[in-house]
């Protein structure tokens, strides 16, 4: 299986790539930070393409470097700063936080899917792995809700080609690539990768347009 993994310059993206590689698949890593990306690609012995997935120009220029035929796209958006309670920040800070969250979380996924979605073979899959945020959160919570709704809508679009598209939302306490990286237990990150991998298998053919949560039930506090 040919797999494209974005966010390859983050620990979470690297973990996703490692999970697919260990399962015997051919992986291409994508990331904006050349140094971190090249280190990850060398350690995993996979191909790498330097590209900022929030930038249409960068994606257009890199398009010819991506595999011509893909079975799976794994989107790992970069972390974004959430201003939280707007009363504690200036209007400018809040605006920047929302724009940053939109670019990092939604546009990076939307633009990547638009750029290479036609490279997917029939029966392929798209999985986006993002941080889980509580309903009462700030910019990140609202933006990730927007992404989930977009994913749900795209299920109908890609379903005509037998392609599934889903989101894995992982709690901050159990993910890598966002915060407390060195303190996050590696087996937990690997569990997230295994869920992403499962969503690309024939056993998950009827799961599409969904957001699956891996958070030790954290959202139960907001139910």
From Swiss-Prot:
<dbReference type="GO" id="GO:0030497">
    <property type="term" value="P:fatty acid elongation"/>
</dbReference>
<dbReference type="Pfam" id="PF13561">
    <property type="entry name" value="adh_short_C2"/>
</dbReference>
<keyword id="KW-0560">Oxidoreductase</keyword>
<dbReference type="GO" id="GO:0005886">
    <property type="term" value="C:plasma membrane"/>
</dbReference>
<dbReference type="InterPro" id="IPR036291">
    <property type="entry name" value="NAD(P)-bd_dom_sf"/>
</dbReference>
<protein>
    <recommendedName>
        <fullName>Putative oxidoreductase Rv1856c</fullName>
        <ecNumber>1.-.-.-</ecNumber>
    </recommendedName>
</protein>
<feature type="binding site">
    <location>
        <position position="128"/>
    </location>
    <ligand>
        <name>substrate</name>
    </ligand>
</feature>
<feature type="binding site">
    <location>
        <begin position="4"/>
        <end position="28"/>
    </location>
    <ligand>
        <name>NADP(+)</name>
    </ligand>
</feature>
<dbReference type="GO" id="GO:0016616">
    <property type="term" value="F:oxidoreductase activity, acting on the CH-OH group of donors, NAD or NADP as acceptor"/>
</dbReference>
<comment type="similarity">
    <text>Belongs to the short-chain dehydrogenases/reductases (SDR) family.</text>
</comment>
<dbReference type="InterPro" id="IPR002347">
    <property type="entry name" value="SDR_fam"/>
</dbReference>
């Amino acid at each position: 299986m040919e797999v494209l993994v974005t966010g390859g310059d983050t620990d979470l993206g690297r973990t996703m790539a490692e999970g697919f590689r260990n399962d015997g698949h051919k992986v291409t890593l994508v990331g904006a930070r050349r140094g971190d990306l090249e280190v990850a690609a060398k350690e995993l012995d996979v191909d790498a393409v330097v590209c900022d997935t929030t930038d249409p120009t960068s994606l257009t220029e890199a398009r010819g470097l991506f595999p011509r035929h893909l079975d799976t796209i794994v989107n790992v958006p970069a972390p974004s700063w959430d201003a939280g309670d707007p009363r504690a920040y200036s209007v400018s800070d809040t605006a920047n936080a929302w724009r940053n969250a939109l670019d990092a979380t939604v546009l990076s996924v939307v633009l990547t899917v638009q750029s290479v979605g036609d490279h997917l073979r029939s029966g392929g899959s798209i999985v986006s792995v993002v941080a889980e945020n509580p309903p009462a959160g700030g910019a990140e919570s609202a933006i990730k809700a927007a992404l989930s709704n977009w994913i749900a809508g795209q299920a109908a679009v890609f379903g005509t080609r037998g392609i599934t598209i889903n989101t894995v939302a992982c709690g901050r306490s159990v993910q890598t690539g966002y915060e407390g990286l060195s303190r996050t237990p590696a087996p937990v990150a690997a569990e997230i990768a295994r869920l992403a991998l499962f969503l690309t298998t024939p056993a998950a053919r009827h799961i599409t347009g969904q957001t699956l949560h891996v958070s030790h039930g954290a959202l139960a506090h907001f139910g």
